[in-house]
Amino acid sequence: MRTEKEIYDLVLNFAFQDERIRIVTLEGSRTNVNIPKDNLQDYDITFFVIDMGEFLKSDDWLSVFGNIIMMQKPEDMELFPPEEKGFSYIMLFDDGVKIDLTLLPVSMLEEYLTRDKLVKIMLDKDNMIKTEIVPTDEDYYIKCPTERKFDDCCNEFWNVATYVSKGLLRGEILFAID
């Protein structure tokens, strides 16, 4: 399995050489200082690009990251229609490394930076990001619900609890466990 440094060097060298890629970010568990690192953590990478079209014409360019043994392109699936303007590649390589690579247009940068605070800027070719970004997992802390949220949760539980008995009485096990 390649090391973290090898993966970062590979990603950053590729991005640095490609003029369409303006910003590279790392998200997720690898940015979280509050959890122990391990070799099984994915590399959640985002490329902010000025032209997504060229990337989407062919997947051949992805081979620079290694020998892909399995890939999923969620935005290209009928099962999960796209929710945003980006495109992602979930890639598993023959050495066990997993890279979740997302392409986003540069125009989405501001919105992106407000969505999740577990972000590290790896490359900013144009100095578009003016403030220091410090990854934090504070959005994931468990917070006490308001009285209203607690009441709503209890109401939902009791409302759908009847589905279990209905499903079991009808012999519809999947309905009962959903």
What role is predicted for each listed range?
Residues 1-19, 27-38, 46-102:
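Metal-dependent nucleotidyltransferase catalytic core
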Residues 24:
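Extreme N-terminal "head/tail" segments of very large remodeling/mechanoenzyme assemblies
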Residues 36-39, 113-115:
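Short aromatic-enriched loop/helix-cap "lid" or pocket-rim segments at secondary-structure transitions
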Residues 65-178:
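Conserved NTP/Mg2+-binding pocket subregion across the NTase superfamily
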